[in-house]
Amino acid sequence: MSTENTLSVADLARENVRNLVPYQSARRLGGNGDVWLNANEFPTAVEFQLTQQTLNRYPECQPKAVIENYAQYAGVKPEQVLVSRGADEGIELVIRAFCEPGKDAILYCPPTYGMYSVSAETIGVERRTVPALENWQLDLQGISDNLDGTKVVFVCSPNNPTGQLINPQDLRTLLELTRGKAIVVADEAYIEFCPQATLTGWLVEYPHLVILRTLSKAFALAGLRCGFTLANEEVINLLLKVIAPYPLSTPVADIAAQALSPQGINAMRDRVAQTVQERQYLVNALQQTACVEHVFDSETNYILARFTASSSVFKSLWDQGIILRDQNKQPSLSGCLRITVGTRQENQRVIDALRAEPV
């Protein structure tokens, strides 16, 4: 048998996948720490007991209790809610439903969350970037100049990793610019820490607005992998065409429904209040720490700070088992590290370690 035209497995793969640099998640980056402040998780576990023990049947595609509970919590109709394997799947579903590979583009504004880029690249969709302004707000002129051929614009508010809200008037301008041209995805993964800023009330006005949500942050369920897409019914119906038939396992749906009960939502709000209190403690302490140049305002469960020698600080804390998130490679974030708000004990360990750093 001739082997002249034999291809390796790598050769058989799509070119864009061969060239793809996968998203560097906190777990993928590894580390042997005992203080994990690099993934914006809630620092302590929340206990649940499974009430659904029947696992020999496939689950519902969109579990009724989860959809109805989330709709009530978010103040939208059940028909405007889709549940998925984390908000990350929601990102991918929107790109798959609206973007033609090799023809259409997505647009995002770095520094921001990395999965918009990775999801588009995986699917073979062009990625356009319009860097944020110096104050990390939207460059509306730059976005307007790049809308031809753009089908989806991603905006993270509050933005990860910078922590600030996007100006609501700028968001409204963006929605007017894109009306009839592109979908605007507002990533509200951290909205529970600033609920007054949600865009859910705008859905009736903007049929091309899509909102992403998650149970990973304030609901303390990062390990559950459960996210939500909020949009008008026409958009939801399109996303339902491309979602997997059984995106949520029965145990995930069971726990999600419990987390979204009135008691679960009250517990979440207590966690938010606790986190905001700890965030202020951490901010105050960082501002009085010699190796810290600047602490940026945050509306989230993490803090971005600029350090005099961020790389050595990052490694020093890593070696002490304190794992932070290095942001040096992000545009305009030279010298910056992101610190998840932990427990008081964890936060104090960070401060003590930073104050021991040479200046």
Swiss-Prot record:
Its cofactor is pyridoxal 5'-phosphate. GO terms for molecular function: histidinol-phosphate transaminase activity; pyridoxal phosphate binding. Keywords: Amino-acid biosynthesis, Aminotransferase, Histidine biosynthesis, Pyridoxal phosphate, Transferase. InterPro entries: Aminotrans_II_pyridoxalP_BS, Aminotransferase_I/II_large, HisP_aminotrans, PyrdxlP-dep_Trfase, PyrdxlP-dep_Trfase_major, PyrdxlP-dep_Trfase_small. SUPFAM superfamilies: PLP-dependent transferases (SSF53383). Coiled coil: none annotated. The modification N6-(pyridoxal phosphate)lysine is found at residue 217. GO terms for biological process: L-histidine biosynthetic process. Belongs to the class-II pyridoxal-phosphate-dependent aminotransferase family. Histidinol-phosphate aminotransferase subfamily. Homodimer. PANTHER family: HISTIDINOL-PHOSPHATE AMINOTRANSFERASE, HISTIDINOL-PHOSPHATE AMINOTRANSFERASE-RELATED. This is Histidinol-phosphate aminotransferase. It comes from Salmonella schwarzengrund (strain CVM19633).
